[in-house]
Amino acid sequence: MKYYSFSSTFNAQKKQEKIDLLLNTNQYIYSLKTDGNWSRMIWQDGEMILQSRTVSKKTGTYGEFQDKVLFADALREAFHDTTMLIGEIYLEDGRDKDVGTILRCLPDKALSRQKGDKILKYRIFDCWYYNGVSLLEAPITERIKYLPLAAKAINSELVN
């Protein structure tokens, strides 16, 4: 899957030209960008994991965050067949580095740091599998139809 953002070499004029081109073709979908940590939620074989984007150089495995978020119980109960959601773990009005500061902690410390306005949330922006159905070959216009269903199944005010 490819998600697009402007190259850092684009100046304001070049960005506007690209936006105008996309608007004139009607070949675009947009969504709110949240500054957090990209991650995937995976339900498979009766288990649920919330994984990082990259493999750790230290452990050689993907980071797992499901024990570091307050919405973990809602995640565990949401699906019983293969489902994979792509999204961003974020802090309301926070930045990526602030999210990372919490997620790099051990689970107990990560949970204790989430107080007041420092509570980690999750924004779903894509769905690759839903209840055993692969959506990998489906266009984004079809996959995004599953986002409200997924958020409803998770049933947590911290996930949208």
Q: PLM ranges: what are they?
A:
Residues 1-24, 30:
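Charged, flexible boundary elements
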Residues 156-160:
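Short, surface-exposed recognition loops or helix-turn segments adjacent to catalytic cores
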Residues 25-154:
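Covalent nucleotidyltransferase
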